[in-house]
């Protein structure tokens, strides 16, 4: 535990999350003062990104020209936006920087390469700039020590989910459907199974990319409620091809990101599919909405297959932006309640937890764990060689 005057005087932690969907900044104001109790969400705040900022972020998901300059100019620019959002939250709650123990800053992932030689991960949104502009200590760079210990550096949220389900008598899954989808498996208390978690594949990423490409003048950058997808028909042969992807079929521990599942990846898949079906004199893609319907089925199947590979029954709690895609939730629910499986499906709201802010709460907890000297990774999840306290501190 650190010995710092700021820690002694403050009461709350702020968790900051900017996800791979690149839609905005999520903030969670969290109280951990009741030892042994679940963390209490005091307030939340959301600030959407402008189209210009979102484009700057997504353009860095793939290698390109002048990317070092672009990345580190954006590193500072995002920190400035983060600080504005923090100040807006403080004003909303009539708090001052002295009321905050620390900010747990995930930042914005622009590249995540956990495999191969010299694996690395890069999150921008400069912690030092954020600390200086807000006058609040920042804990960030949470993924790097886990990777230094041979882990994937992701996912990090399962250990926080474990804190929320301490009294579970049934197997529970937390399914976060962001740009990338990930699951946490929380076995029953009397089970000898370990908590597991991994990225299953694309969540909203490909759905958003394909929608935006074909609706450039839409006010939305996503397929609201999956409405467009529902006008199309799933293409079974294309779905089968997508499900054969190497990442989908790789074993955990594993993690991925937008540098893998992106529009260019999809275009390559479609080109290969059209060539294969053309050689068989088949025409199976009639409308772009058919591809959207197939992508929705791909997300639902990759998630459901991962869940059913671990157990045949349990409770599934959904969170993340994908929860608001009605068609996607229905497709996932249909798969999990078919055949011989017995799953009860809810959103995190059933537990009185705002699923939209859950990841931000997790990074508030990671900052708290840093201050308490608690282990905050799960080697069974990330593949790290040891448990450790994650993060680094940046003083104002």
Swiss-Prot record:
<dbReference type="GO" id="GO:0005524">
    <property type="term" value="F:ATP binding"/>
</dbReference>
<dbReference type="GO" id="GO:0016773">
    <property type="term" value="F:phosphotransferase activity, alcohol group as acceptor"/>
</dbReference>
<keyword id="KW-0547">Nucleotide-binding</keyword>
<keyword id="KW-0808">Transferase</keyword>
<dbReference type="InterPro" id="IPR005338">
    <property type="entry name" value="Anhydro_N_Ac-Mur_kinase"/>
</dbReference>
<comment type="pathway">
    <text>Cell wall biogenesis; peptidoglycan recycling.</text>
</comment>
<dbReference type="InterPro" id="IPR043129">
    <property type="entry name" value="ATPase_NBD"/>
</dbReference>
<keyword id="KW-0119">Carbohydrate metabolism</keyword>
<feature type="binding site">
    <location>
        <begin position="19"/>
        <end position="26"/>
    </location>
    <ligand>
        <name>ATP</name>
    </ligand>
</feature>
<dbReference type="Pfam" id="PF03702">
    <property type="entry name" value="AnmK"/>
</dbReference>
<protein>
    <recommendedName>
        <fullName>Anhydro-N-acetylmuramic acid kinase</fullName>
        <ecNumber>2.7.1.170</ecNumber>
    </recommendedName>
</protein>
<dbReference type="GO" id="GO:0097175">
    <property type="term" value="P:1,6-anhydro-N-acetyl-beta-muramic acid catabolic process"/>
</dbReference>
<comment type="similarity">
    <text>Belongs to the anhydro-N-acetylmuramic acid kinase family.</text>
</comment>
<dbReference type="GO" id="GO:0016301">
    <property type="term" value="F:kinase activity"/>
</dbReference>
<comment type="pathway">
    <text>Amino-sugar metabolism; 1,6-anhydro-N-acetylmuramate degradation.</text>
</comment>
<keyword id="KW-0067">ATP-binding</keyword>
<keyword id="KW-0418">Kinase</keyword>
<dbReference type="GO" id="GO:0009254">
    <property type="term" value="P:peptidoglycan turnover"/>
</dbReference>
<comment type="function">
    <text>Catalyzes the specific phosphorylation of 1,6-anhydro-N-acetylmuramic acid (anhMurNAc) with the simultaneous cleavage of the 1,6-anhydro ring, generating MurNAc-6-P. Is required for the utilization of anhMurNAc either imported from the medium or derived from its own cell wall murein, and thus plays a role in cell wall recycling.</text>
</comment>
<dbReference type="GO" id="GO:0006040">
    <property type="term" value="P:amino sugar metabolic process"/>
</dbReference>
